[in-house]
Amino acid sequence: MRQNTILENVTSAQLRSDIPEFRAGDTVKVYAKIVEGSRERIQLFEGVVIKRKGSGIQATYTVRKISSGVGVERTFPLHSPRVEKIEVVRFGAVRRAKLYYLRALQGKAARIKERRRDV
């Protein structure tokens, strides 16, 4: 058996199928499990997806939000069991795959138009 086939068999079992379609510019709610001492709880992180990277089991996405006037970015593995669920709040209309320019913007300048969805 080829090494590539073995690798695909191992990773295909770990891929998640409950992930909604989203891309850079979309606002998402990420419910992440965090461990505090002996307790495990779910922490909500809501913000704009500024990038998606990789494919397969290595795929990641970065979410940016403003918390108490400070920009906070968190990168999550797409297929991580530590992420309980992902909800898409709104679909953003952007023309870039990586939205690093949002780091320099603040207030109304950092707003993203909503993408029209055909029903």
From Swiss-Prot:
- The cysteines covalently paired via disulfide bonds are none
Q: Please give the InterPro entries that the UniProt record associates with this protein.
A: Ribosomal_bL19, Ribosomal_bL19_CS, Ribosomal_bL19_sf, Translation_prot_SH3-like_sf
Q: Recorded GO terms, molecular function?
A: structural constituent of ribosome
Keywords assigned by UniProt, alphabetized: Ribonucleoprotein, Ribosomal protein
Question: From which domain of life does this come?
Answer: Bacteria
Mind telling me which SUPFAM superfamilies this protein's record contains? Translation proteins SH3-like domain
Q: Which Gene3D superfamilies match?
A: 2.30.30.790
Which cellular components does GO assign to this protein?
cytosolic large ribosomal subunit
Give the GO biological process terms. translation
Checking Pfam families in the record gives: Ribosomal_L19
Provide the family line.
Belongs to the bacterial ribosomal protein bL19 family.
Say what the protein does.
This protein is located at the 30S-50S ribosomal subunit interface and may play a role in the structure and function of the aminoacyl-tRNA binding site.
Instruction: Write down what this protein is called.
Output: Large ribosomal subunit protein bL19
Name of encoding gene: rplS
